[in-house]
Amino acid sequence: MYLLTNNANSNVIVAALLLILGLVLIIKGGDFFVDASVWIAEILHMPKFLIGATIVSLATTLPEMIVSIIAVVEGNFAISIGNAVGSVTANTGLILAISAIFVGGVIDRKEFGIKAMLIMLSGLILFGFCLTGKFGIFPSILLLLILIYYMYETAMSAKRASLANKETSNEQVEVKKDKKAVITNIIKFVLGVAGIVIGAQLLVDNSQIVAKAIGISDGLIAITVVAIGTSLPELITTITSIVKKQGELGVGNIIGANIIDLVLILPICSFISKGNLEVAKQCAYIDLPALLVISSVAVIPTLINKKFTKVQGIIILILYIAYIVLAYLGQQGKLFY
């Protein structure tokens, strides 16, 4: 690991500081990586709608993905799965709730309905197969098929919006290609990847140390500190959209991040584990049901009313707090961990 001192208290303090450093590196590295990825896509003359629908969406999910991959390689399935599932629950129960409470917003029922259906379908697939205690290759393939459909539908939706604004799918974006811009973006790309990888390693290793020191499980710290930490970019985007009175921007960002977290991260981890991704009872009987309940409250009333309401946001936030308390009490009673 990263700690060499023999003093237990010093170990915990240093581990906590390294954990925070890991989060900072992940967040800043993610920013650099997204900026550089978009620049590269523009240099290759990718249509603007395709950049937004694919490159940005996948790039912003990289921090969660790297954290889960490192965890599964190290054999810590609790953090690997807990990070992915916990990030989706945190995005919905905390970040989306905040957006609904302070801004709300009318939604496009057709566009939102497709994404809502994919979130619920993905959650049900995860829940059903995780009850067996393992998440194997077959459900992973199902989720990847959902990912392919989601990326296609998102690209087509963005293309329709682009054409409505009298832009063509072949629009070429003017982008700086001078030597300084090339060097700057190459450095951003390298630093971004390095920041995410190093930050993820620090986060995974030191979260385990902190968890053991304060007497909680890897699973609990995964759905709280790790999941919320890797969801900070979405939180920042949402707060920015609230300040700018553009609630729909935050909602779109959250929904997209949730789908990709569910249908991309866990299948990759399952393939790495050769179909032997072990699922703790805590995840199967508390985390995933909580995800489904919170997601249902987020999407069903929204589809009916065509908007997010303040009351809905408050209910979602209360459910999320109740879930965290239940997870903690379950761990204290040694029911699942």
State where each predicted segment sits:
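Hydrophobic alpha-helical segments, chiefly the membrane-spanning helices
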Residues: 1-337
